[in-house]
A protein has these predicted regions:
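N-terminal beta1-alpha1-beta2 module of alpha/beta enzyme domains
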Residues: 1-75
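A short, mixed-charge helix-start or loop-turn motif at secondary-structure junctions
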Residues: 51-55, 82, 127-130
Length: 132
């Protein structure tokens, strides 16, 4: 059985502290969340909670996931890194390929990517990308 540690919505300093501890404890990997940003207020309904309220707000840090993997991979030796989920429609395919390949190089191929369509309409609006 494999166990993964979720680190979404954590401050980057806490991620750096927790990654080596998770590795020492025998976890298989770390899961990271992806958002370009979290707006201060939004009307979008969070689909993964009963009341539609997300577990984050506009003050929550969302460091760029490929850079985060590169950093965490330098202080661990075997942990895998899962982006759960990468919001595909918000980026150009070449940018995705570049970021993913860079993370794979720095992590020695310990990067796993889960794609998703996204749920936060305000994030799309900010980038002038149609939400459909």
């Amino acid at each position: 059985m494999q166990f993964w540690q979720a680190l979404p919505m954590m401050h980057p300093d806490e991620m750096l502290e927790l990654a080596p501890v998770a590795e020492e404890a025998g976890f298989e990997g770390i899961m990271l969340a992806d958002h370009i940003f979290a707006p201060e207020t939004f009307d979008s309904r969070y689909p993964y909670s009963e009341g539609g309220e997300p577990p984050f707000d506009g003050t929550t840090p969302f460091p760029e996931v490929f850079a985060t993997i590169a950093a965490l991979s330098q202080i661990t030796t075997r942990l895998r890194f899962l982006i759960n989920v990468y919001i595909l429609p918000l980026r150009h395919p070449i940018t995705i390929a570049k970021g993913l390949s860079t993370a794979a190089i720095f992590s020695k191929n310990r990067t796993v990517l889960g794609f998703g369509a996204g749920w936060l309409e305000e994030e799309f609006d900010c980038l002038s990308i149609p939400f459909a």
